[in-house]
């Protein structure tokens, strides 16, 4: 496995954990990964005159341009947009559509589950509702729940960056270990 897909996987793990835990994507991690990718692409191109960085630069621009409208209308966080642009830089523009499709399907499934739970909740028998409420009250006062609540600082929503990480992981594994016909 080459350096850039490996870097994409490592960044994906960090982003997924951060997004699931705090609903936040670290600018520092994105900047470090971008700097490492640009340095790697420049050195590779200067030394071997192969692997022109065009596909990677186009990937970064396409990733930013593709998701920026969703940020502008409030459907997505800025961290998701920046992370998608960095994925474009790391993996090239050809990875963006499959990664986006996988992430969107996962996020759509997540949204459908939330919607279904809200619709089914009134149909639950009262005894089960009481048990659920009691369990949630116990979990709500657990130190880990308090820590997560403090880390999120009121941020809610679907962890799209975590789903982008999953899409990137699947794309890298498929392109690295796929059997050619």
Predicted regions and their residues:
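A membrane-topology feature that recognizes alpha-helical transmembrane segments
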Residues: 1-181
């Amino acid at each position: 496995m080459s350096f850039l897909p490996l870097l994409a996987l490592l960044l994906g793990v960090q982003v997924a954990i951060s997004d699931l835990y705090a609903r936040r994507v670290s600018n520092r991690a994105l900047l470090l990964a971008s700097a490492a990718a640009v340095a790697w692409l420049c050195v590779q191109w200067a030394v071997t005159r192969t692997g022109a960085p065009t596909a990677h630069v186009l990937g970064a621009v396409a990733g930013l341009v593709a998701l920026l409208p969703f940020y502008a209308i409030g459907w997505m966080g800025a961290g998701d947009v920046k992370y998608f642009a960095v994925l474009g830089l790391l993996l090239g523009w050809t990875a963006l559509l499959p990664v986006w499709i996988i992430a969107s399907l996962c996020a759509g499934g997540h949204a459908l589950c939330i919607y279904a739970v809200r619709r089914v909740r009134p149909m639950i028998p009262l005894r089960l509702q009481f048990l659920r409420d009691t369990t949630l009250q116990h979990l709500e006062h657990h130190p880990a729940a308090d820590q997560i609540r403090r880390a999120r600082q009121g941020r809610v929503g679907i962890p799209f960056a975590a789903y982008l990480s999953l899409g990137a992981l699947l794309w890298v594994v498929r392109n690295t270990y796929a059997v050619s016909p």
